[in-house]
Amino acid sequence: MSSKEQQAAGRDFKRNSNAYSSLPPTGTGAGCSGAALGSGTGTGKRARSKQHQLEHEQFGLSNSLSSESIRQACAYYDDELSDEDLIEIQQTPQAFHQQTKQPLQLQPISFRLGDELGDERSAFCGSQEMQQVPLSTPIKQAAETDEALCVLSELDAILDVHDVSQLNGTCSSGSVNSGSDDDKVEDYLMDLDNYLEEMDNALNREDSLIIIDGHTSLKREPRTRTLPLSRKKKSSKKKSEDQEAAQGDFQREHQLRKTFSCSLRPTSQIASSSGSLETSTEPVMDVWRRQSMRRALEQEDTKATVAMEREEDDIPTLLVELPPRRDAEMRRCFSQGDCQASVAPTVGSQMLTEAHIFDNLLQTNARASSEEPRPRQYGRRLEGPPTPVRPLILAQSRPQSAPTRVQMREPQLQDTPTHPIMSTCSELSSARSSRMPSPVSLPSDSSSSGSSSAEHDQEPDPVQTTTMCSASSTTPLEPLHQLQLLLREKCGFNSQWPHAGSRTLALIGCTLGVFNMCRFAVLTINFGGNFLLQFLLLSVIFGIPLLWLQMCLGAKIRAGPVSMWKISPICAGVGIALVMQQCFLALYSTVSLAWILVYLRDVFPTAARSGYRWQEMAFPYRYDASNATGNLTQTVAEYFNVVVLQRLHLANHPDASGIRFHVNDRQLAFYLALIWAAVFLILCKGLKSLGKLAYIIYTLPLVALAVVTAKFVYVVDPSRIQNIFAASDFDDFLVNSNSWTAATQETFLTWGLLGASVIAITSRSHTNANKAALRRDAILLVLFTLIGLGLMALLALCCAQILWQHGYVYVPGSFENPDCYTSIYSLQSNTNPYLLSYPRSLIPHYSSFIGETYRRNRTMIHVESGFQALRFISEIFPAVLSLASDSISWVWAAVAFATFAGFGLAQLCVMWKPISSALGNSTSSVLLSCVTGLLLSIPFATEMGISILYYVDFLLGGSWFIPIIWTAQIFGVFLIRGRPYNGDDLVNDLRLCGSMSAFLALSWNVLLPIGLITLSVVDYKASLSNQFYYWRGKSYFTYWSRKMGSLIQIGVLLVIPVTAIIQIYRYLAHGPPDILERIQLLYRPPEEGEEPRRPSARQTASQSRRNALGQTTEGGQHDAQNDAPPKYTPPPSYTTATGARLAKLLRQSIRRSVRRVLGDSSRTRPVLSLDAESASPAAPPDYLTILTNPAGSSFNADPSPASSSSPESIEIDQRPVGYSQRSQSLGRKLHRSGASTLERRPYTAEDVVTILRSSVRHRQSQGGGNLVTASTLPRPPTAAMSTHLEDASFRSIENLVLNAEPPDRTPGVELELELEAGQAEECARNNTSVI
């Protein structure tokens, strides 16, 4: 070869060596070009690398590529296609799943991307035998034009037209070509390069595409622009041969234009070396894999959501297998990661001219502009081999023969820590089914799709996995998993409990506080053992089930007492009323804790006194000088009223002011501030701080109570312990109404009063909590509560025995004046027999939250209320400590009062927790709530604070309207909302035994509503609350206070209906266009992640029925009418016809409304399920497929073998006559096994026609032969059908029509009946109609 030829060969494609990868040349041209290059060098080093260059030149356009290799690489053939070839082209996707290997065939290329960044991003080639598909189609008939096809075709045309003689020369020819021809070829190649750059600019604007076999979503990376035309003619610096040998494939730092090709069969000249050719392709392809994947990772957009797929078994890769043809090659072009395939058809002697290219581009643009967008496709409409559909892909992007790919928009980034996994199914919708949107999609089996994700039964991940099976779907799917919804909440404050036992200890504060412990102690002293047994019995029947119901609601709904009514917004007023009532309880009960701190302060001895302060005289001038110590009967009562309550006006003290609403001593205000500061420190970090301190504020008081009780038992004379229950008269167990009233009220105040806090506490759990955690908490809470109350009852009985030993007796007093607030009397000094001998068990009693009311003198109820707060701490316990000071030191007294203060602080924290959470989940909201609570509790620390305390406690503390609110909650949850929050479902969360679960369900549904209403009546009578509503008679309260009290009690109850009215206005004024949808959102909104019913489904079904009626009328004109004409019937009058029609419309409207409101699942249409490709799809409605003809014989339409083999035919099997899915009340269903329905496809419109036609009336033919006709609408059932079959038939027909897929969405159903030969064509023509 001359030097000029060598220079021309060196200039060929040298400037584009970094922008092109090559096509494999066939024949000897490639080898000769390499030999010529090797001979031109003349050095031994080039001779050693000669063979290495030959191997690489088989795969790439090297710097020294000869004209013959270009000719062989760009060769194309145009064979005329036969009819068989065209059929095979259409059936090419059916061969995607075949995987038989051909030994001498190179492998088509597919991609599989790794999940992790650290994994090797590999692309592999697989060879699989498939059906024969022609490699080319005529240009004007091609559906789409590939980018790589256009590039190679233009290159081929330019080379053939302008330098045919030069390209046809071999490497051994010694002819000398002119320099002008070489320059001309180079100029055309540079023009082609500019054309490719313009194509790159257009392709860069395309959206990112997802490869079907890939695991990640990669955006299209732009190519690096080549040099300008002025600089392209400058020759680049020549690299050394060592660098060419080491870097003969690709350079890593450049954006490459990759054009890769593999030959299915080598030409005859190199057929003997096919084995070595296969071997030589592997290293080059391996390097190409690494570089392309690295380049894709570098250009990946960080804002794009990385789609992660669940771990699946080996899914067959979709590969296109092309048959081997002699002297034919297949070009596979990969443009920046997109899988595209294309071939260019020509005849062997015909050249591709510029006119052909221009015409082809015009046709492509016309097709792209005329292509209409297609809406989203729900579900799958075609079983069998996947059919490629490209509604959103450009016309030039890929050929028909390439594997199907899916184009989708980038999903928006979620705010949650985890993202839903988008799994793209390989089974796509057909072109016919993508035209119209479908509001209803029936679940279908995925047994025919080997790559469907429904074939893999896997446990659900914490991150929601959604399956997307539509090629044109661009709507992001919503995650459904409950754990992902929980992760959206603010973490670190009220998200979860820090320890496993924190929730259990916090729940103890709801049932075990200083107030109910003091009440329980005093009631045990007054009523004895009868009260204990009655309380235990009522707790088992009513109290404990009520507590467990609140725990189950909190754990099930996972929301607070107000936000829990997202399940039924119309009942939100119930939660607001409960929180309001509990807020008032927390405000006025705080001052009682300040009283305990005053007692704790005065326990410690000082230098001025050696004993307790309540042993000294409060006012020495009131007593004789001889009585220095004073009477214990007076000192204990005066200490509480004067020193603790600061009621200085009672003793005419000089420091007393004329204004009773005055803070005489600021000690109570200081203790109130100290208490609220402690509450803030405990709740400042939400559940995190409360859970950590729960082990201190709940455990230590309980342990200290046990220690103090043991000490008092030790002090009591052992011989008198056996007489503790001797005073109890068990004969009055059933007849003493006062005892039963006290036990009933105490049961509710202990187990149900603070239910709002129970719901708020149980709505959160520990991170590692299992399903049995709720049962553990429920059982431990009951045990700890009963133990605490039992210890307190034992302590109270010991104190009563100590008083009896020292000659004192306890008689409940009243707080009003010194004459009545004394409660400890000495048997020696007091001689009033009426006061000492009156049995305490017969005194009328009423319990409120912080105190009790005993009406000793019924004639003076308008003067003495009989109320006293914390009777055990303010009346009994200080007197016992004074009498037993020799055996019980002040240390034990300090421990006892500290224990009571700890119980009170713990209960105040759990009461204030839902109130502070209502303002917000932050430290500032807790601080704001605590400061507000401090300011609102200051009035109770004034001189008249005890009077205000009694008034508020009488109105709100355990009043008659509180049980009514809890009754409304039970009705709202069980009746208005219903499933899945009824008793049968909630009781399963406790995981108790069968008998206990049945009893709880019975108690929640029947016993609790009855018991709460009865308790409301009992409270109303026992508390004398009628004085608030009868303003004429005498009363303890003033006229204005009675009006205010009635307004407060009724106002709390009116919160429920007022909130319901507001919610009705909000939901009916705004929302979905369908009024029934709005009503459903108001009463029974769908759960989070559950799609509401679609009103468009009913409209579509109605439209389908109207279409069916119209088509039936047209088709009925051709049917033979053999029946005799009916007898004459006079037409109805206008009034009768109009009234009947209106009555029918009204009846149908009421039925639809009731079904929508009650959620009757027997009439519910199946809606689109986001997990339609899940492993266990829901079974379609049970349709009746056995229909009977007038003769009474069973008619079964079995497809013929020809139709059954077609993928567009179905098989209608015979089912049992019994209707196995009959609806029950309140939406319940008899569950049936779906084994017979899970293996069949959903019914389409054509299926419905076929099934309904199987119930036709067989009419006799006219004029020879029997004519069997089919009617679209079924006739009413005859008398021969049974009643059961008659009822099931109409229900099945209605379900068939309502649940059928819309027409024109799936291929028609071909059902060939067993007809006579003369009527086969007519039957087939009738079966093509749609409803």
Curated annotation (Swiss-Prot):
Q: Where in the cell is it found?
A: Membrane
Q: What happens when the gene is disrupted?
A: The imaginal disks of third instar larvae are dramatically decreased in size. Overall larval size is unaffected.
Q: Say if the entry is tagged with keyword ATP-binding.
A: no
What Pfam family does this protein match (any one)?
A: SNF
A single GO cellular-component term on record: plasma membrane
Which keywords has UniProt assigned to this entry? Coiled coil, Glycoprotein, Membrane, Symport, Transmembrane, Transmembrane helix, Transport
Bias (Low complexity): 437-453, 1197-1209
What this protein is called in its record is Sodium-dependent transporter bedraggled
Principal localization?
A: membrane
Glycosylated residue positions: 168, 627, 631, 857, 921
Q: Which domain of life is it from?
A: Eukaryota
**Keyword Transmembrane helix carried by entry:** yes
Q: Where is the composition biased (Polar residues)?
A: 16-25, 258-282, 413-436, 463-473, 1097-1115, 1186-1196
Where is region (Disordered) located? Answer: 1-62, 221-284, 363-473, 1086-1136, 1169-1238, 1256-1275
- What range does the record give for the signal peptide? none
Q: Which organism is it from?
A: Drosophila melanogaster
Membrane topology for this entry? Multi-pass membrane protein
Q: Output compositional bias ranges, type Gly residues.
A: 28-43
Task: Extract the GO molecular function terms from the UniProt entry.
Answer: amino acid:sodium symporter activity; L-amino acid transmembrane transporter activity; neurotransmitter transmembrane transporter activity; neurotransmitter:sodium symporter activity
